[in-house]
Amino acid sequence: MEIREGHNKFYINDKQGKQIAEIVFVPTGENLAIIEHTDVDESLKGQGIGKQLVAKVVEKMRREKRKIIPLCPFAKHEFDKTREYDDIRS
């Protein structure tokens, strides 16, 4: 499955083009971004898709030199347990 980038989101579509996973973020000011929500279809649960989506946002925000506020409960959980994200968390 390919993770694609859209406007303020990363997402995955199924073979029919239906979106089956997404993470939405909002750039705020010059150096912040907020992860608003993550949604993964039930058929993909337990496959690490949510983690991959969070990692994509982290990668993009590091390139843009932005810190992240993980408001989404799933993203917050990932930030809490992934020490490699400490440097980018606001």
Swiss-Prot record:
GO MF terms held by the record: acyltransferase activity, transferring groups other than amino-acyl groups
Family matches, as InterPro entries: Acyl_CoA_acyltransferase, Gcn5-rel_NAT, GNAT_dom, GNAT_YJDJ
Signal peptide: none
Sequence ranges assigned to domain N-acetyltransferase in this UniProt record: 2-90
SUPFAM superfamilies referenced in this protein's UniProt entry, alphabetically: Acyl-CoA N-acyltransferases (Nat)
Pfam family, one: Acetyltransf_CG
Gene3D superfamilies registered for this protein in UniProt: 3.40.630.30
Source superkingdom: Bacteria
Protein name: Uncharacterized protein YjdJ
Species whose genome carries this gene: Escherichia coli (strain K12)
